[in-house]
Curated annotation (Swiss-Prot):
Site for Increases the nucleophilicity of the active site Cys, residues: H88
Gene: ftrB
Co-factor(s): [4Fe-4S] cluster
Enzyme class at the top of the EC tree: oxidoreductase
Subunit structure: Heterodimer of subunit A (variable subunit) and subunit B (catalytic subunit). Heterodimeric FTR forms a complex with ferredoxin and thioredoxin.
This protein's UniProt keywords: 4Fe-4S, Chloroplast, Disulfide bond, Iron, Iron-sulfur, Metal-binding, Oxidoreductase, Plastid, Redox-active center
Active site: C59 (nucleophile)
UniProt name for this protein: Ferredoxin-thioredoxin reductase, catalytic chain
Parts forming coiled coils: none
Organism: Pyropia yezoensis
Subcellular location(s) per record: Plastid, Chloroplast
Amino acid sequence: MKKQNLVSFPENLEAMRKFSETYAKRTGTFFCIDSSVTAVVIEGLARHKDQYGAPLCPCRHYEDKKAEISATYWNCPCVPMRERRECHCMLFLTPDNEFASDLQEIDKTTLTEQIS
């Protein structure tokens, strides 16, 4: 599959980091206590955005990623997250989730260290 080189991967990574922070704050959700989970999910969203032009949920298997992107159901934030605040990836956790931290931000250094 041909890569869309509209924006470089580092720019998409930063865009997904900012999106994740903003969305967590807006929805009153929190990142996982294990920052590597948060980092890997943000990286996956950025890679899908880089490859396909959309932040398709990286925690699921798809037979046809382009079809899934067109359907929009699993584009982040996915329908289960928007409707029920259920994030399969554990990126956005409700405060009562045993794996939720008290963080709604992840700095660039932590993100980069966790995915290198």
